[in-house]
UniProtKB/Swiss-Prot annotation:
Belongs to the orthohepadnavirus protein X family. It comes from Hepatitis B virus genotype D subtype ayw (isolate France/Tiollais/1979). Keywords: Activation of host NF-kappa-B by virus, Activator, Apoptosis, Host cytoplasm, Host G2/M cell cycle arrest by virus, Host mitochondrion, Host nucleus, Host-virus interaction, Modulation of host cell cycle by virus, Transcription, Transcription regulation. Its main location: host cell. Changing S33P: In strain: Switzerland/Strubin/1999. This is Protein X.
């Protein structure tokens, strides 16, 4: 069974943290800078990419000490708007890749907490591929059921 994650904004460090639910005492947070818009260098992705956590459908950068590419990208505070409908997140992320206004940090936090991880872990929806492509992530998924081509998935 796949682990569940909780998503919390840490205003003191200005990061969005991901933690396994029910593992607060033993799990380290996965966090990413809210101001970083570029994908990390290959060295930012550790060789032990956390497959032991059984997190279905997350790319290897989710276990980077710098945090997941898409969360770092989609949490940039300097690109804010009132858009809050989670159904159009891929379009919102595409606008961000073009440097246009997009979803607010609060809306993104709610989306990741209430929708995205539920879709990934409970429903296995393929929207995760599109989210990470448009969010600037080019890392492979961990425990993906079949080979996937990010560039044709979007």
């Amino acid at each position: 069974m796949a682990a569940r994650l909780c998503c919390q904004l840490d205003p003191a460090r200005d990061v969005l943290c991901l933690r396994p639910v029910g593992a607060e005492s033993r799990g380290r947070p996965f966090s990413g800078s809210l101001g970083t818009l570029s994908s990390p260098s290959p060295s930012a992705v550790p060789t032990d990419h956390g497959a032991h956590l059984s997190l279905r459908g997350l790319p290897v950068c989710a276990f980077s000490s710098a945090g997941p590419c898409a969360l770092r990208f989609t949490s940039a505070r300097r690109m804010e708007t009132t858009v809050n409908a989670h159904q159009i997140l891929p379009k919102v992320l595409h606008k961000r890749t073009l440097g246009l206004s997009a979803m607010s940090t609060t809306d993104l936090e709610a989306y990741f907490k209430d929708c995205l991880f539920k879709d990934w872990e409970e429903l296995g929806e393929e929207i995760r591929l599109k989210v990470f492509v448009l969010g600037g992530c080019r890392h492979k998924l961990v425990c993906a059921p079949a080979p996937c081509n990010f560039f044709t998935s979007a």
